[in-house]
Amino acid sequence: MVSLMGTLLFLSLRGLHVLLAAVWVGSMAFTSYLLMPVLQGLGPVGGHVMIGLNSKGMTRFIALISGMTVLTGIYLFWHFTGGFDPEISRSHAGRAFGIGGFAGLIAAIVSRAIVGRSAEKVARIMEQASMVPDGPQKGELMQTATLLRQRVATFSTVVLAFQVIALILMAIGHYV
């Protein structure tokens, strides 16, 4: 019975890990290649869209998905290596999963620390700018928001690159 429960837990967490990773990678691909270019082209209106996304919890959603992906991945690596056995970790498959996991961890950190925080700052600045009359102060706020949106766009692409590395290494891990 313990073996069956362990197998069911492993398979459930593996399925959850793949599902979470798919949602996370898809979200970042959408953000990098569709959403951010459109928002940058909209100028000040793009900031209002970011306010809406922030109020709906987009940054919290991405943080939750990335965190759960990393945590389930750590469990899967622990399971694969028999409790982080160094010999298994040094195997080709262990290295592929380990490097892929590290790339995923970097993606999660950059996603939250840079992309998420910058997106939240844009939303706060745009809310502030909406209450300021046209003039130099509003211009400075809009310029800051534009720079932060560019940071979100740039680092969303960086996150996606690390996710692709993780995705490829996870896909080939059992076959190397």
Where is each model-derived feature located?
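Polytopic transmembrane helical bundles with strong interfacial aromatic enrichment
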Residues: 1-176
